[in-house]
């Protein structure tokens, strides 16, 4: 195991675990264990089942609908996972996002409209994301 592999921790959100498994296989690392729950009232819970202290944490989570989550739930799960990693003393947290929800809302087309893509980026930064890595999952599978 290389030094990079020792200091790296890779986790999957609920939306695209298959992609996370492919990335883990390609990097020759194991996916970390994180407990993710969605309560009956819609609230999301995340708890790392292993230490991430001092690790460079990579969270694979598409911000789109899938696996019983809508785009907003997927984003909230990512933010909660980031916050949990930061509070558990991760050295850095990178969001690996295969689909960046709200990316099309990147400019104002009319007065009094939000720039929601910027808001999502600001939310990720506020939660503690150090890096955002966007990938095209179709291209990713073709690169292999």
Residue ranges and their predicted role:
Residues 35-71, 75, 79:
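Active-site-flanking structural segment that lines cofactor/substrate pockets
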Residues 7, 56, 91-93, 130-131:
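Residues at the starts of beta-strands that form the adenosine-phosphate
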Residues 5, 9-26, 36-41:
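Positively charged, low-complexity intrinsically disordered leader regions
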Residues 141-144:
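Conserved small/polar residues in nucleotide/adenosyl-binding loops
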Residues 119-134:
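A glycine-rich helix N-cap at a beta->alpha junction
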Residues 23, 95, 136:
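Residue-level signature of catalytic and energy-coupling elements of molecular machines
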Residues 66-84, 109-122:
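Glycine-rich anion/phosphate-binding loops
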Residues 98-100, 137-138:
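Short, ordered loop/turn segments at secondary-structure junctions
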């Amino acid at each position: 195991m290389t030094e990079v592999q020792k200091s790296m921790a890779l986790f999957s959100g609920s939306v695209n675990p298959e992609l996370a498994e492919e990335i883990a296989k390609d990097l020759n690392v194991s996916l970390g264990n994180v407990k993710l729950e969605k309560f009956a009232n819609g609230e999301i819970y995340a708890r790392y089942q292993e230490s991430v202290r001092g690790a460079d944490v990579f969270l694979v989570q598409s911000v789109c609908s899938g696996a019983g989550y809508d785009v907003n739930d997927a984003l909230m799960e990512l933010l909660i996972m980031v916050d949990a990693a930061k509070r558990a003393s991760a050295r850095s947290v990178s969001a690996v996002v295969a689909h960046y929800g709200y990316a099309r809302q990147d400019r104002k087309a009319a007065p009094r409209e939000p720039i929601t893509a910027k808001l999502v980026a600001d939310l990720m930064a506020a939660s503690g994301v150090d890096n955002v890595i966007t990938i095209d999952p179709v291209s990713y599978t073709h690169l292999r």
